[in-house]
């Protein structure tokens, strides 16, 4: 079967990077059954031939109007599809969609008519915000990192920036590679507009957001970047839990030590692009 990836090495590289990351998600135990979702903006790789490809699905509503997505193209994991299968066959377990001129609906154009993720409204709302603000970020990742989800079941970590402070204090790399910390979204029904709106508010100041008792959403320059930030935070959560399992609350780095890391390495306090 002919694929849109044929003779398009740059697009193919992006799709296969997505496949690589989904393999990592499965290996880490973050992607049970069909858990998790991915959406990546691939508009820059769409040539005139791609833009002329007829739809292979009916026009479907997004559920909201997103003015900055007009004519944009996204690779989306399919609803009900497993990350472990996507890792092997990305174009059979995900699809490329085109946003129509009304900015409120989409159609599938390649390779097969795979219905996008059930969290599509949230993912596209984030993509709309990134485009609106001129960000260079292209990818959104939703997954279920075990230790971070576990921490979200404890009220202490849902207050203010308490979870961020604890995670930053576990190892300098967390502060260095997740300098915006982790935002908190109180529990909301999965796939709901309320969840999308709350996530959008937190993503304005964080690259990774915790959905209470559910999972994380991360944005990044590409899907590997979004994965790396989530992975770094989850490592810190694992260190915290290992220390607790030895019978004590870990000391963590002091506020002064963390400030020294921030100052010496000139860590950003806002999204770099």
How should these model regions be labeled?
Residues 1-273:
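Glycine-rich flexible loops
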